[in-house]
Structure formats: structure tokens, C-alpha cells
Amino acid sequence: MDGQTCLFRQAKHTPKKIGQFAALWKRPAMSGEIAPFDRDDGIDKVIILAEEHPRFGVFVFPCRLLVEKDIFSEKSIGGKHAFRVYAPWVMPSAAQAKRAKIWQCAHFAELTDTTQGLAQLAKVL
């Protein structure tokens, strides 16, 4: 996208926890082991689709932010295989989830209303 390497994932609804689950890992070798993406993997942005009928939208996270939040590893240290995303319409009660929602929603564009959604999308891209 515009000369940048983007990774796309669709977040999954889980029945017992609020928010949606986004798997974000790679299989670097034929060994079968999985690992978090790393800052040096050449990914500029991660786009995650979140849907909860009738609402939907996308999170657009820059690589540097995912490193800062310890979701991407740096020099193969740290990182996560998956994490929860909290769209603006989700109301988590746990303090950690509320903190995550704050930084995540700064990178979210709701596309339910296309006119307004496209303007939001232009901001987060």
C-alpha cells in the first residue's frame, strides 16, 4: 500500500472474553515453531479488521507502535503471538483492557458509515 508493506489480519470474536482476538505470528523455519513478528521483518503496518454486526472497522498499527507495545519483537527479544483488540463500541471493565483500548482506538477507523469512515481511514493510514 503506497510503497509500504502491510500485513492484514481479521480479528476473531471469542465467546468468553470481551474484545476480539488477533493472531499475529510467523513461522520462520520449517521446524514448525511459531514466533512473533520482528521489527526487522520489513512490515510497515498491520491492518486488523474488527467486526461486530452491524459495526465494523480497521485498526492500522505502525510497526514502531507494535514494537513499543511489545507485540512485535526487537532483535528476536519479546513480542507476542496474539493480542486483543478493543473497537470503540466495546466497553471493557478490566483496567489493562481499558488502557489497551485507549491507544488502539487512536489507530481505528470505523467503516460502518462509509462517508465518515473513509475520512477516518485517511487519518490512520
What are these regions (language model features)?
Residues 3, 12, 28, 52, ...:
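Short, flexible loop/turn elements at secondary-structure junctions
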Residues 7, 22-24, 45-49, 57-61, ...:
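Ordered hydrophobic segments in well-structured contexts
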Residues 69-116:
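Helix-rich interaction surfaces within compact, conserved domain-sized segments
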Residues 30-69, 73:
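Structured, beta-strand-rich domain cores
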Residues 113-125:
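Intrinsically disordered, low-complexity terminal/linker regions enriched in Pro/Ser/Gly
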Residues 1-41:
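Short, well-structured hydrophobic secondary-structure segments
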Residues 17, 41, 53-54, 76-78, ...:
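A generic structural signal for short, non-catalytic loop/turn and secondary-structure boundary residues
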Residues 15-22, 66-74:
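Short, surface-exposed linear segments at secondary-structure transitions and domain or protein termini
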